[in-house]
Amino acid sequence: YKRQVEEIADEISKNRLLFYVGENCPSFAEHYDRLTANCASTTPYIELTDEDDAAIYFSSGTTGFPKAILHNHESLMHAARVEQNHHGQTKEDVFLCIPPLYHTGAKMHWFGSLISGGKAVLLKGVKPEFILDTVSREKCTIVWLLVPWAQDILDAIDSGEVTLSKYELSQWRLMHIGAQPVPPSLIARWKKVFPNHKYDTNYGLSESIGPGCVHLGMDNIDKVGAIGKAGFGWKVKIVDDKGNTVKRGEVGELCVKGPGVMTCYYRDPKATAETLKDGWLFTGDMAQEDEDGFISV
């Protein structure tokens, strides 16, 4: 993003210094090596606990001004374990992450690679040929797609815009898709082109450290359209307006509970009290559970 930063460098450098890591340091920044030249080479020992504050993420602001969401270290570690568990990730896997890392959705999917010791590839660009070429060159085994990107890939194949035989895709084992409802027709179409692919999707929000608190696993492709069941290490319930659990088939508010629930809305005790109750995160999303225990929103 050097070019983009250069365009606004004068504006954003007021009352702050800009540092650069890598070769060809631009004139608007100071090189990080110069900053650290006289610093000790040993790593400072900083004792951390699971309960220590780790990160602040911001909500999308769909219901008002974006809220600052505080998470601790246990929350971030749980996100990594959830991704590793749901995708069966090992150090041999290569995960392709396309969405930007400034939100929890992309970053927590990426964390599965960090805890597994596997490689993650970050791709800027969503054209079908970019995605397929990257999967081929980097030998990606897990690819996270949004619904429009998956549709674009299938359309490009159908139109002849891309030719699958040009790419080495045999190692690609899992197509993860999410961030919005997934049409069953899309997955049926995908399986015709990629019959050996496993498929999964999930549900989450920034307050639950991103995706995974509800998960539709690789063995439940017949339930496409649902968001799934409680994810690894999570509990879920659906309640009425009085907080009582509803019966299966009835509509109520989806609530989740687990190690990934936020600590609070930063410096907003009123909003925190409205959202966190007895350890449960009230998501604000209406949902129902079918006869097999699968949840739809």
What are these regions (language model features)?
Residues 2-3, 67-70, 97, 119-126, ...:
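Short beta-strand->loop structural element characteristic of the AMP-binding/adenylate-forming
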Residues 115, 140-145, 154-222, 235:
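Gly/Ser/Thr-rich phosphate-binding loop
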Residues 77-94, 102-142, 156-157:
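Conserved AMP-binding/adenylation subdomain of ANL enzymes
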Residues 1-34:
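Structural core segment of the AMP-binding/adenylate-forming
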Residues 53, 59-62, 95, 101, ...:
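Conserved S/T- and glycine-rich ATP-binding loop of Class I adenylate-forming
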Residues 20, 25-27, 37-58, 65, ...:
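Conserved pre-ATP/AMP-binding loop-to-beta segment of ANL
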Residues 35-36, 59, 76, 228, ...:
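Adenylate-forming
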Residues 244-249, 253-297:
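Conserved ATP-binding/catalytic segment of the ANL
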